[in-house]
Amino acid sequence: MRSRLLLPVPHLPTIRETSEELSHGAPGQEPPASPSLDDYVRCICQLAQPTSVLDKATAWSPPNRSCRPAWPREKRHQSESLEDSSPCFSSLQPTLPAPGTDNPLDWLFGKSQEQQTDRRDLPNRTGSSGHWGVHRQMGKDSGRPSEARVPEYSLGRKPGHRHQTSNLKSWTSRKPCQALASVSSSRPSSILGTLYLHLPVIHEL
């Protein structure tokens, strides 16, 4: 029963049959030439460009021409800002060796020695200020700011002379407790002095 119903239905045309009919066409006409690759690319380019956008671009073209002189002004402003900022960057860049120097390593070695000498001078300056601050604090704690001691290397005195003056002051003070305190306070100051000389100094960049 089912086979009888399917028989009177006409078969659908396949792709091969339709392509043959289109290619042959009428019996007296020649088959049309197949499009080349260039034609195919041109068609795609034309389809990719919508006409509405092109019409809007052509309509807005006159005002764009009037706005074109603004570009050179912006470029001039940018060049002036770059020229103003160039001295700041040039000061940060390291100095290059002179063209007359034969070996650049000698120049680099000389620069490193100069930096080392500058770093050695800085600890001495900071160390002297640190000694003064320590002696002032010790004098304030003991209640006798007049007895604050000066570092040895600043006045060029010998350590023995300093101990003699401290001993004389202790004998004239009429108080053995104060004499012992002055002798004990002289020892930490000398220890702190040696520590400040050997401590490394950290330079902020």
Curated annotation (Swiss-Prot):
Q: Which Pfam families match?
A: DEPP
- Name of this chain's protein: Protein DEPP
Spell out the InterPro entries in the cross-references.
DEPP
Q: Which gene encodes it?
A: Depp
Where is it predominantly found?
Answer: cytoplasm
Give GO terms for biological process. regulation of autophagy
Please give the superkingdom of this protein's source: Eukaryota
* Subcellular locations according to the entry: Cytoplasm
- Coiled-coil segments, which residues? none
Swiss-Prot/TrEMBL keywords: Cytoplasm
- What are the annotated GO cellular component locations? cytoplasm; mitochondrion; peroxisome
Question: Key word Cytoplasm present in the record?
Answer: yes
The annotated region (Disordered) lies at 56-173
Function text: May play a role in autophagy.
Q: Where is the composition biased (Basic and acidic residues)?
A: 71-80, 138-150
